[in-house]
């Protein structure tokens, strides 16, 4: 049998990963192009939370407290994602666009923040010949604020646009693809930026960070080009009263179980994320792992999360109830954190590595299941406020978790060193308090999640067998 070029092309498109995410309203080519905005957000995420963190502390000699304050600025902006989503839902223009203007201005904010950032960091390091002494802190704060606002605005509007164009059947697969593109953006950016900054100097820092800002604008323009249909509006339509944020939030809160779902996501994210900055130090300080060995902990966590993603997607495709899958993820997390506490007692490095994988497995199961439910919350056909509220809850909880986890460990360690805790002065004490707290939060999350399984709550029924596919209901920021 001779295959024509058209048949071969159609087969190739069918065999592509996430080919089932395409639909008549959002073809695969347009979906792949739209997903480029996630690459730019992933790139900014790597810069703000990873590369520039190291550069400020090691190469520029900025105090760690100042670095922590700067990095926390994008997290402080996260709660406003719900407002940004609502504004994009109710935005009116002569062209009829709702999402594209927010994508565009979010791109400008993000690019502007990255353009200003290298100069402000150089000032922050003390390399200043004129001007007020506080100029470095002020300009660095403005740069991080601009980049943070741009990231949140771009991501919220982009996800809402994808949700608008996708069908009910393909929406989870669409958001799953966007999540994968976010990870790809982070991975590629980390490798390229790290390679470019291997021989560090101030000129190289300026070129790399501003180059990322320029790439942000290029990627996002390609992503948003001809993605939203123009629906011209008359002057009377544009001047008609708009729904207020309070009214929209009231409608969202009126959805059965919506606020409980957000509370579940916040507490669960807090429980799983407090250990993010402590896992590797715990392995090194308590179990005596070398630097090369501790890096495998993060790899094990990521592998566990991937297994949790695949297993949960398979269970959902077989008709499992999403809330019960989430509960199983919480139980796995409880067992994993308990194993972390027992690993130094047995002196078992193998148990500790298995615990790291278990934490990833539990968080993956919990995240996929709850996010599958979140995408179904649509208020009067507007998905922006729901997506914004979801992103605000998740991002805020993750940021608070990192701060609370690190602060708790340091406070307990200092109290023990000062003798306030009597004979309790083990190096593992501060970490133990954090892990026990996380176990308690996981039990609280189970209690909050329980009523959602009842009939009448969000997504109480089982999907038909074979109906669910591998996909995310929302993007975990």
UniProtKB/Swiss-Prot annotation:
Which family, according to the similarity comment? Belongs to the PucC family.
Location in the cell reads: Cell membrane
Where does this protein chiefly localize? membrane
Biological process terms in GO annotation: photosynthesis
Among InterPro entries, the record links this protein to:
MFS_trans_sf, PucC, PucC-rel
List, alphabetically, the CDD domains matched: MFS_BCD_PucC-like
Tell me the domain of life.
Bacteria
Q: What keywords were assigned to this record?
A: Cell membrane, Membrane, Photosynthesis, Transmembrane, Transmembrane helix
Q: How does it sit in the membrane?
A: Multi-pass membrane protein
Protein name as catalogued? Uncharacterized protein in puhA-bchM intergenic region
Sorted alphabetically, which SUPFAM superfamilies does this protein's record hold?
A: MFS general substrate transporter
Q: Per the UniProt record, which residue ranges are transmembrane?
A: 31-51, 60-80, 103-123, 130-150, 177-197, 205-225, 248-268, 291-311, 334-354, 359-379, 384-404, 433-453
Keyword Kinase present in the record's keywords: the answer is no
What PANTHER family does the record point to? 44.5 KD BACTERIOCHLOROPHYLL SYNTHASE SUBUNIT
Q: Which GO terms describe its cellular component?
A: plasma membrane
